[in-house]
Amino acid sequence: MASLHFPQWAVSFVFFAQAVGSMDTFIAAVYEHAVILPNKTESPVSTEEALLLINKNIDILESAIKLAARQGAHIIVTPEDGIYGWIFTRETIYPYLEDIPDPEVNWIPCRDPRRFGYTPVQERLSCLAKENSIYIMANIGDKKPCNATDPHCPPDGRYQYNTNVVFDSKGRLTARYHKYNLFEPEIQFDFPKDSELVTFDTPFGKFGIFTCFDIFSYDPAVVVVKDTQVDSVLLPTAWYNTLPLLSAVPFHSVWARAMGVNVLAANTHNTSMHMTGSGIYSPEAVRVYHYDMETESGQLLLSELRSRPRQHATPAEVNWSAYARTVKPFSSGQADFPGKIYFDEFSFTKLTGSAGNYTVCQKDLCCHLTYKMSESRMDEVYVLGAFDGLHTVEGQYYLQICTLLKCQTTNSRTCGEPVGSAFTKFEEFSLSGTFRTKYVFPQIVLSGSQLALERYYEVSRDGRLRSRGGAPLPILVMALYGRVFERDPPRLGQGPGKLQ
């Protein structure tokens, strides 16, 4: 039997926040859900059998939703694939799908469940929102029939979409979003012809929505923030952590800071697939996060956020190459060597002392590092790495990355492999690069995959990620992760289908 694990400190915090809050602030909740998965099959199950599995998952989500509502939460986000999992073909997912109408129809499924056919999942979610007076965001599947008059209609005569839905506190369907940037294994779904910029207004700010892999792309992730001026983003995800550079919590939290919005990120929980890492992030700080590779339990997180963070002072825009372009490359007297991180070939140079200045370059990108360790350990090796190129595995997107990281062993061939702990502590550091993009996401991950607290580091206006002093930090990885959107390849094909 699945169980819920709710941190006592999070619940206690919310009691305080509820007492002092107003609609200038709101209580956000996210739930990291250990999804009950279907048995793998090559033949579709019946609609009744599919609904049985869906309801088992919603039973767990219901407990989290009710507890969040009792603690004063105004909105809760649940994960991508959170009600049926991800082990599907195009045919086997079909019994799990419902026809989800455009929210403009002004529909409360809890009151009128048969208005758009058989929609038990939408009815149950609507009733949960209505009965608990809370906004609920859930990820479900949408189906839309098509025919030969549509040149993009799939051979089976239907579109199938990975879909986010939001029900407001009265149970009304208030938002629907079809995922645009499908992850390569999502063969069960189509992507819409055009990206959808989906927003909705609440008494506690304006919200935007996208899903998991969308966050890597300009459209819709950056566009919905820039063009619609949302205050907060809802991010359901089924994110498997690919250390050292693509762990959910560091990437989602720094995206919130870089884009100047709140991010409510709910991940699925499956340790066998390295899926964990949910959080509530503001532009100023990480409010609360959860990362757990030890248990198989779900986790509810709650935090108070400003409803309209854009109305508050924001840091000046960073010129990410300003400092680095004034620096003459440091000479270490040793040759660079290649190494791979998530299939991308980096150029690495080894740090050989307890303090120093290093430069490593690849194509147009030169990365500069100045550092001082508390002591140099013989059993731990660190490298400075640079990557400037097109990532081509499980998606295609152009990256410029500068990173300081610990190698898995003292053998340089393990540099770039996942590492869990570090004992070397850095007292001072400054990392910069000659980036050709303004979309650079700085992150620092410490031993045990913990985030470095904001008080220990800063980003200067001239593009340096540098220490502020205080306690020495046991760094696993420090990175400036740049996305060069204008160098991404074009999407192949204009209609629904599998991304190439």
Curated annotation (Swiss-Prot):
Ubiquitous with higher expression in liver. Residues 31-307 form the CN hydrolase domain. It is found in: Cell membrane. The keyword Transferase does not apply. It comes from the Eukaryota. CDD domains: biotinidase_like. A lipid is attached at G469 (GPI-anchor amidated glycine). Belongs to the carbon-nitrogen hydrolase superfamily. BTD/VNN family. This is Vascular non-inflammatory molecule 3. It comes from Mus musculus (Mouse).
